[in-house]
């Protein structure tokens, strides 16, 4: 008899109910729980899967390149990046009538196309690509690389090529390779590409495989490097009237510190970016060589951590025992990695609009809005994952004996103080922020808007002034020509930076007022509440006052009856589940704020945000309702336009979102009754009764139904806002 799914769990494979299928899918990636899994095999499986992950990323990027080269308008877009819409790919749909064909035929194309809102055109243009042929070449190269990585993944699963457990746990060697190799050398290589290919291309000089070894990126070659005259590489930068992609106004500098933006492209100076990557390379290559590997010199991570003991004795054992705790727990390591990547992802969202690195990206408003929203939502999901794996660490990997008295144990010991403080902050922020908003709404409703409580964000304005924003009149640090900070950099990067920060045609340090003050605190409420739920879930994962033996029940468990006081909604998984709703809520406020604020700036009408953002009806009426009208009329009884697809996606997203509630509100008994009824009717229906199944149908567990609900809620939520965002922005700016 054929073995049933799942092969990795004989217990589940023999389950006579449909639970076998759903639990099999749910635990497919929980390698630790699989039959016969050893620690060494676990590490090897995860290591090999990384190659598959890289192959997928390369194939995906390859597909982007290929479709733009085949069906896009890259070469036309380069000639006029501000007025030609970049095409992502063609669309072929048998349902299109003539109006749809005409509506979606854009960007100089001969048939229906999708417009790219991801900024890839600007990225490829900035790094030196100029022709479709180069896009094809890159696409083929990445496809081949994907094949190489798939082979490498397979190879590392073969017994001869499987790394040993000691190899995976050699922390110092890993730091050496990751810091020096992954970050350092790749940054150096990228600096090389920018200096040898991208900067010449920005000055109208083509460098390809045929001439890159003979074309000097700087007139003096390597002479200044070897003679110590490094300043030569910063001399003669591009002038303020440089036209990107041509030699008009171009200089010869390759590594500069100009500050600010290129006046034409409104992006960072490429020579500044090259300088930045070179500095990163030097720092990381040195950093990666600090640790003791083969030669008996350098730091030992274990010694460093064990030495970190607060001297007075009042703070316990410090970092003692942490080396083994971290090094032996994949969940701890994954939690740290996810927390770092989540933070970085959110930072990318902030920086890609405030300091745009790619030429002309700042003027592609739809791409700006899409990139910001995309990175903030991804950051939110990743950060929630960090706490989920932190909780799993406490349940599966934490050893109280090994961590006696250290910082980890002490955090668990005073978790009540941490949780209650977060709770207090959340309550304070919630009541005060909502109180201010509601007061202002009442004043608007009663016709006395002058009685609103409007608070200027003076501390934030002071911080902006310290960076050089002169508008507020604070005479401080970079806003004061008498300060040492001002004079120290006056001859280097400061003129460019001050021009940028005091200019009204970019997004650097936007002017802020009472509306910003309120929404800032609303976002702070969301962040603190999300953090409260996640931190409580992780710190209570092993046990709480109500359920001291929680760790024996694992990460996710359903209700355990009234006998123990009721254990519904207290597993670490439940905390993750609840936190995702708050995370989505928070990112919603963040993206609303970003988008509405920028719509005003891009349209030259900042007063609308300033006046309407101080009360809730302003947000609902002047942001959401006002900007959804074009979207909702993408198709109606009179016809359709190019927003029709987003109107449809908007509707679809609402349906997905609503489906989520069906799973979230009903409990297990409902599903069991529903399934029994369906089975009964199925078995009594002609023809349908011929189809039998071996597994006895049982309802979703509470946890499963909640997961299904959560996924539908999340997907619907993000897709609803995504379609609103792209439609409302592109309808205004093309």
UniProtKB/Swiss-Prot annotation:
Binding residues annotated for phylloquinone, in chain numbering: 671
UniProt binding sites for chlorophyll a B3: 662, 670
Primary localisation category: plastid
Keyword S-adenosyl-L-methionine: no
Gene Ontology annotations for the cellular component aspect, listed alphabetically: chloroplast thylakoid membrane; photosystem I
One Gene Ontology term from the biological process aspect of the record: photosynthesis
Topology versus the membrane: Multi-pass membrane protein
Catalytic activity: reduced [plastocyanin] + hnu + oxidized [2Fe-2S]-[ferredoxin] = oxidized [plastocyanin] + reduced [2Fe-2S]-[ferredoxin]
This enzyme's EC code(s): 1.97.1.12
Residues where chlorophyll a B1 binds: 654
Binding site for [4Fe-4S] cluster: 559, 568
Transmembrane feature ranges: 46-69, 135-158, 175-199, 273-291, 330-353, 369-395, 417-439, 517-535, 575-596, 643-665, 707-727
UniProt keyword annotations, A-Z: 4Fe-4S, Chlorophyll, Chloroplast, Chromophore, Electron transport, Iron, Iron-sulfur, Magnesium, Membrane, Metal-binding, Oxidoreductase, Photosynthesis, Photosystem I, Plastid, Thylakoid, Transmembrane, Transmembrane helix, Transport
Compartments, record wording: Plastid, Chloroplast thylakoid membrane
GO molecular function: 4 iron, 4 sulfur cluster binding; chlorophyll binding; electron transfer activity; magnesium ion binding; oxidoreductase activity
Function: PsaA and PsaB bind P700, the primary electron donor of photosystem I (PSI), as well as the electron acceptors A0, A1 and FX. PSI is a plastocyanin/cytochrome c6-ferredoxin oxidoreductase, converting photonic excitation into a charge separation, which transfers an electron from the donor P700 chlorophyll pair to the spectroscopically characterized acceptors A0, A1, FX, FA and FB in turn. Oxidized P700 is reduced on the lumenal side of the thylakoid membrane by plastocyanin or cytochrome c6.
Similarity section: Belongs to the PsaA/PsaB family.
Subunit field text: The PsaA/B heterodimer binds the P700 chlorophyll special pair and subsequent electron acceptors. PSI consists of a core antenna complex that captures photons, and an electron transfer chain that converts photonic excitation into a charge separation. The eukaryotic PSI reaction center is composed of at least 11 subunits.
PANTHER family, A to Z: OUTER MEMBRANE PROTEIN, OMPA-RELATED, PHOTOSYSTEM I P700 CHLOROPHYLL A APOPROTEIN A1-RELATED
This protein's name: Photosystem I P700 chlorophyll a apoprotein A2
Organism: Oltmannsiellopsis viridis (Marine flagellate)
């Amino acid at each position: 008899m054929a073995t049933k799914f799942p092969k990795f769990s004989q217990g589940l494979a023999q389950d006579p109910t449909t639970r076998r299928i759903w639990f099999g899918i749910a635990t497919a990636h929980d390698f630790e729980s699989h039959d016969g899994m050893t620690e060494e095999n676990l590490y090897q499986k995860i290591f090999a899967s990384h190659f598959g992950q890289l192959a997928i990323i390369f194939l995906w990027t390859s597909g982007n390149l290929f479709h733009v080269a085949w069906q896009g308008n890259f070469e036309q877009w380069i000639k006029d990046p501000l007025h030609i819409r970049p095409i992502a790919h063609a669309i072929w749909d048998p349902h299109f009538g003539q109006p749809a064909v005409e509506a979606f035929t854009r960007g100089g194309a001969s048939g229906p196309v999708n417009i790219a809102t991801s900024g890839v055109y600007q990225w490829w243009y900035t790094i030196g690509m100029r022709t479709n042929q180069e896009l094809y070449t890159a696409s083929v190269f990445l496809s081949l690389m994907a094949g190489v990585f798939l082979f490498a993944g397979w190879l590392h699963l073969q017994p001869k090529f499987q790394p040993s457990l000691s190899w995976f746990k050699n922390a110092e060697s890993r730091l050496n390779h990751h810091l020096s190799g992954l970050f350092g050398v790749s940054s150096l290589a990228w600096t090389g590409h920018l200096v040898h290919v991208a900067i010449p291309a920005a000055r109208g000089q083509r460098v390809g495989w045929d001439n890159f070894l003979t074309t000097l990126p700087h007139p003096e070659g390597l002479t200044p490097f070897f003679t110590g005259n490094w300043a030569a590489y910063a001399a003669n930068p591009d002038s303020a009237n440089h036209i990107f992609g041509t030699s008009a106004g171009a200089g010869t500098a390759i590594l500069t510190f100009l500050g600010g933006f290129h006046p034409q492209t409104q992006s960072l100076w490429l020579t500044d970016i090259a300088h930045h990557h070179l500095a990163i390379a030097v720092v990381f290559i040195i950093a990666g060589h600090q640790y003791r590997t083969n030669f008996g010199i350098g730091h030992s991570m274990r010694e460093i951590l064990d030495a970190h003991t607060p001297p007075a004795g009042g703070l316990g054992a410090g970092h003692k025992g942490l080396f083994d705790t971290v090094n032996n727990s994949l969940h701890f390591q994954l939690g740290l990695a996810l927390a770092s990547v989540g933070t970085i992802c959110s930072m990318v969202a902030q920086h890609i609009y405030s300091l745009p690195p790619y030429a002309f990206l700042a003027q592609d408003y739809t791409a700006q809005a899409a990139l910001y929203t995309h990175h903030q939502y991804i950051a939110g999901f990743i950060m929630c994952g960090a706490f989920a794996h932190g909780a799993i660490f406490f349940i599966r990997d934490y050893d109280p004996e090994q961590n006696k008295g250290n910082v980890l144990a002490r955090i668990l010991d005073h978790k009540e103080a941490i949780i209650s403080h977060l709770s207090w902050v959340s309550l304070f922020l919630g009541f005060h922020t909502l109180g201010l908003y509601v007061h202002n709404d009442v004043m608007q409703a009663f016709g006395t808007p002058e009685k609103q409580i409007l608070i200027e964000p003076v501390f934030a304005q002071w911080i902006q002034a310290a960076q050089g924003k002169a508008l507020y009149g604070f005479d401080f640090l970079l806003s004061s020509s008498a300060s040492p900070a001002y004079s120290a950099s006056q001859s280097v990067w400061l003129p460019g930076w001050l021009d940028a920060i005091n200019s009204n045609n970019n997004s650097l340090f936007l002017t802020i007022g009472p509306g910003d003050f309120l929404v800032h605190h609303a976002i702070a409420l969301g962040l603190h509440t999300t953090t409260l739920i996640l931190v409580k879930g992780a710190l209570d994962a092993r046990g709480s006052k109500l359920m001291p033996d929680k760790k024996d029940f694992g990460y996710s468990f359903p209700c355990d009856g009234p006998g123990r006081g009721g254990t519904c909604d207290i597993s670490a998984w439940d905390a993750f589940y609840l936190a995702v709703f708050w995370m989505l809520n928070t990112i919603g406020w963040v993206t609303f704020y970003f988008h509405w604020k920028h719509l005003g700036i891009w349209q030259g009408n900042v007063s609308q945000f300033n006046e309407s953002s101080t009360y809730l009806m302003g947000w609902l009426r002047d942001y959401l309702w006002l900007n959804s009208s074009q979207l909702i009329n993408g198709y109606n009884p009179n016809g359709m336009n190019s927003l029709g697809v987003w109107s449809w996606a908007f509707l679809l997203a609402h349906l997905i979102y609503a489906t989520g509630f069906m799973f979230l509100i009903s409990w297990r008994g409902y599903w069991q009754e529903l399934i029994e009824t369906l089975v009964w009717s199925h078995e009594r229906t002609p023809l349908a009764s011929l189809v039998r199944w071996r597994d006895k149908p049982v309802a979703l567990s509470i946890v499963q139904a909640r997961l299904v609900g959560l996924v539908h809620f999340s997907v619907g939520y993000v897709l609803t806002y995504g379609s609103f965002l792209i439609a409302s922005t592109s309808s205004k700016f093309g």
